[in-house]
Amino acid sequence: MNKNILFIGANGYMGHGMSLNLLKQNNLYVIANKQRKNIENLIKEGAKEINSYEEIKDIELNCLMLCVTNTPIAIEIAKKVSPLLKNTTLVIDLTTHNKNGTKEMKNIFDKFKISFVVSPVMGSKNESLKGVLGSLWGGDQNKFEESKIYLDTFCENIFNFGSVEKACAAKLLSNFLSLLTTTTVIEYFKSAKKLDVDWRKLFEAAKLGSGNSGALGRIAEKAISGDYKGYSFSVSNTLKDLTYINDLLKDLPNAE
C-alpha cells in the first residue's frame, strides 16, 4: 500500500498496536505527547517522528488517524491540525466520542473541505496488536472503500453504520453492552467464591447456557488460573464511557 500516514495517539493503549500494523505496509509518522515508550518502539520499527503539528505542512499525507482519550482532547487537536492539512488527506477518527463529538469534529474539518470519517474500534490491546479489531465506521459513503484500505491493516471486520453520528451511537451502545456483561461476569465469580462454588465447573456449565459470552470467556479462562487481567479496562475509561452512555440514553422513554 505504501501510504503516508500520521497517527496521533500512537503511544496509547490501543494506538500502539494499530500503528505497528500500519507500519508493515506504509510510511508512518508519529508525534509524542507525554509518554514516549511506545513511540520509541515504533521509531525502532521504522516510523518517523514529527516534533510539532506545523511539520504536517511539509508532508504529503494520504491519511491522518486519530485515537485519543476523549472528545475534548480530539476537538483541541482537530482545531490545531485542520488548517495545516491538504484537502486530499483523509481523516479517520478512531476515538470514542460523546454523542455530539463526531458531529463537532466533522464540522471542524468541513470548514477546510477535508474528508472526515469515524471508525471507533471494538477489542482490546491484544486484538490491536494482532490486527483483528472490529470497526464501527461512519461518514461520507464515497470514502468507505478508501477508509478500508487503511482499516484492513488492523481490523478483522468493518461495519458501515452510515453517518458519523450513527457510528458514534453504535460504539457507545456496544460499550454499554460490554460493561454490563463484564460487570455481571465479575459479580458471578465473586459470588461463587463467597459461596465456595468451584469456578472451573461453574464456568464449564455456564458455557452451555444462554449466559455464555465473550466477556465470560475472556475473564474466566485466566481468572481460574489466578490471572485477573483477562479483560483489561481502566476505571477512568469506564467512567468516561458510562458518562457518555448516560448522556446518549438519558432522554429515551425508558430512561430513569
Residue map of PLM features:
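Hydrophobic residues within alpha-helices
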Residues: 14, 18-19, 105, 150, ...
